[in-house]
Amino acid sequence: TLPGRTLLRGLAAAGNGAVQYPAALEHARWMTDLPAGDPRVTGALARLTPQPLRPWVERVDMQRFYAMNVPRTYIRCLGDAAIVPAKAAEYAARLGVTPIDLDCAHGPMLSEPDALVRILEKL
C-alpha cells in the first residue's frame, strides 16, 4: 500500500502542497522489476516531478464517473508492489471489468512497453 496520510502530508508540506518521493522509494514501489541502475529507471526518476497532494487524500464523489457511459479497462500488473494483484482485482471489479494481466511491476511502460502496446492496440 502507499505510505500513510501523515507521511504524504509531511512530504507535501515540505513541497509546497505537492509530493515527490525520494528516488529510492520510487524505485522500491514502482519499478521493482528493473535493477536500480538500469537506464530506464534512472531516466524515469530524472523526469519525475512533484504531484499535488489533494487527489491522494481527498474523497471524490464517484457517482458521476460511474454514470458515464465510457469504455473501461483495467490492466493489472502482477508484480506490482504498490497495488498488489488482489487489490487491483478489487479495483477492476468496481469498474465492472475483468482485468487484463501483465507480468510486470507498476510501470509497464518502462519494463514491458511492447506488451503494454499490444494490450492498448486491442482496446
Sequence positions of predicted segments:
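Flexible "cap/lid" loop of the alpha/beta hydrolase fold
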Residues: 1-27, 55-56, 60-61, 83-84, ...
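Pocket-forming structural segment of enzyme catalytic cores
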Residues: 17-47
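Active-site nucleophile elbow and catalytic-triad environment of alpha/beta-hydrolase enzymes
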Residues: 46-65
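Short, amphipathic alpha-helical "lid/cap" segments that border enzyme active or binding sites
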Residues: 113-121
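Short, well-ordered coil/turn elements that cap or connect secondary structure elements
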Residues: 67-69, 94
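Conserved loop-alpha-helix segment in the C-terminal half of the alpha/beta-hydrolase fold
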Residues: 77-110, 123
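Short beta-strand/loop motif that positions the catalytic acidic residue
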Residues: 68, 74-76
